[in-house]
Design a protein with these regions (language model features):
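N-terminal acidic leader/helix
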Residues: 1-28
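Acidic, low-complexity, intrinsically disordered interaction modules
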Residues: 18-55
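Charged low-complexity stretches with an acidic bias
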Residues: 51-67
Length: 67
């Protein structure tokens, strides 16, 4: 899977989540449920888009590197 395919999968996948969630929460939870690397990105790499939407791109990039 290329980075572009991964990113597209994540951005399409979050459409099913609750609308009252921030985008970062959706991205975090989707990657956590499907790829199981979200907490590693959060704790080992210090990138946390759950609380900071401005880190979504960096979070997706870091998660992809761990696949």
């Amino acid at each position: 899977m290329t980075y572009e395919e991964f990113r597209e999968d994540v951005l399409n996948g979050i459409k099913a989540f609750q609308n009252d969630w921030r985008e970062g929460q959706k991205v975090f939870n989707y990657i956590d449920s499907k790829y199981r690397v979200a907490r590693k990105v959060q704790f080992d790499y210090g990138v946390d888009c759950f609380y900071r939407d401005d880190l979504i791109d960096k979070f997706i990039e870091t998660a992809y590197k761990l696949l």
